[in-house]
């Protein structure tokens, strides 16, 4: 019922507007009303494939379903425009409209970033992380972190990841002393923890392995 009233009101408005223009301007032609071109956002993901890229595509599909033809997200794979470590600054400068990645990838800017995703192994679950973000004050702290870094960004947390597993090793690890000297790849706070344990850690985004 509400939709029907809305259509009638719109029809009357268009008719009244046409009459008003013709009366005021005499022989003024009314142009065809063209549909506005859809807004396209250029968003780069930190993933070259796998489940993380599928998560990004799923997010894009949901946005397209809600926005119809008015909004389009052009999802770019890892390193398409800038390196993963440069994505945050690229969005801030307007080189990219958005980025799909984890905060721990800019750990070099602030170690606090790792508190918002990709923590050390045996940490909290993805559900616990989102609960803290949305109901425990995490989002406010994240926005405060953005402000302290001077970044003009608006973030939305989606596709949460659980804490990463400790890893896969050539030999069974039975004692922490066996980890000394092992070469290990990770990102974020886990890197500092494992280096304290004597491991040789390389911080490298997953999409660049």
Residue ranges and their predicted role:
Residues 1-12:
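N-terminal secretory signal peptides
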Residues 23-24, 33-34:
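Cleavable N-terminal signal peptides
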Residues 50-74, 192:
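Short, polar/charged alpha-helical segment
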Residues 37-50, 71-75, 181-185:
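Short, well-ordered beta-strand elements
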Residues 69-71, 87-104, 183-185, 199-201:
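Alpha-to-beta junction loops
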Residues 24, 40-59, 78-83:
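Extracytoplasmic "Venus flytrap"
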Residues 2-4, 61-64, 102-206:
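Contiguous mixed-secondary-structure segments that line small-molecule binding/active-site clefts
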Residues 76-89, 187-189, 201-209:
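Short helix-initiation/N-cap motifs at beta->coil->alpha
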């Amino acid at each position: 019922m509400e939709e029907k009233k809305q259509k009638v009101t719109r029809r009357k408005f268009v008719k009244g507007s046409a009459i008003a223009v013709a009366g005021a301007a005499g022989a003024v032609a009314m142009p065809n009303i063209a549909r506005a071109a859809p807004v396209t956002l250029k968003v780069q993901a930190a993933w070259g494939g796998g489940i993380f890229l599928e998560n990004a595509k799923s997010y894009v599909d949901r946005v397209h379903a809600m926005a119809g033809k008015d909004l389009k997200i052009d999802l770019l794979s890892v390193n398409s425009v800038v390196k993963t470590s440069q994505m945050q600054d690229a969005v801030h400068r307007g080189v990219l409209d958005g980025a799909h990645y984890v905060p721990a990838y800019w750990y070099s800017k602030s170690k606090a970033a790792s508190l918002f995703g990709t923590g050390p192994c045996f940490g909290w679950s993805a559900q616990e992380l989102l609960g803290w973000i949305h109901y425990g004050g995490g989002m406010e702290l994240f926005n405060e972190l953005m402000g302290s870094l001077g970044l003009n960004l608006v973030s939305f947390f989606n596709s949460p990841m659980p804490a990463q597993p400790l890893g896969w090793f050539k030999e069974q690890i039975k004692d922490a002393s066996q980890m000394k000297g092992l070469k290990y790849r990770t990102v974020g706070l886990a890197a500092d923890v494992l280096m304290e344990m004597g491991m040789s850690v390389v911080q490298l985004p997953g999409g660049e392995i």
